[in-house]
Amino acid sequence: MFRIGQGFDVHQFVEGRPLIIGGVHIPYEKGLLGHSDADVLLHAVADACLGAIGAGDIGRHFPDTDPRYKDADSAELLAHVWSLVRQEGYVLVNADCTIIAQKPKMAPYIEEMKKVIARLLEAERSQVNVKATTTEKLGFTGREEGVAAQVVVLLQKSEA
């Protein structure tokens, strides 16, 4: 059996925070605002995985009203989500990830993001695609107010 999940997340830029996207620290003058480390890409991956197994969203599992998740490492949150996926008996077929940001340029960091996501999802790098696009200076991402990410995952019931 196959299951598809789709995830989407948005965070706004603020001064004084590190910029972490896809588990990679990116040198930039601003970071993303959030209760956790605000890793917009890993949040979208987590939501896609949760959606594929019908388990709600990251807000339900890691509420921003819970102090345990203040400044949480999103890689740890995704690792927990992946353990739920594995408990349901699924493995990753593939993940297709899109980062939407005017700045900074993501190209230098894409391969490392793929490596991080593949490791967290117990997959090969070839099963994870990460790409970035701009909105041609339109909307909040175009005005450099924040970053968005969308992710689609395909899971398959494990034979093991």
Curated annotation (Swiss-Prot):
Its EC number is 4.6.1.12. It comes from the Bacteria. InterPro entries: MECDP_synthase, MECDP_synthase_CS, MECDP_synthase_sf. The record marks 35, 134 as: Transition state stabilizer. Keywords: Isoprene biosynthesis, Lyase, Metal-binding. It is an enzyme of class 4 (lyase). CDD domains: MECDP_synthase (cd00554). 4-CDP-2-C-methyl-D-erythritol 2-phosphate binds at residues 9-11, 35-36, 57-59, 62-66, 101-107, 133-136, 140, 143. Involved in the biosynthesis of isopentenyl diphosphate (IPP) and dimethylallyl diphosphate (DMAPP), two major building blocks of isoprenoid compounds. Catalyzes the conversion of 4-diphosphocytidyl-2-C-methyl-D-erythritol 2-phosphate (CDP-ME2P) to 2-C-methyl-D-erythritol 2,4-cyclodiphosphate (ME-CPP) with a corresponding release of cytidine 5-monophosphate (CMP). Homotrimer. This is 2-C-methyl-D-erythritol 2,4-cyclodiphosphate synthase. It comes from Geobacillus thermodenitrificans (strain NG80-2).
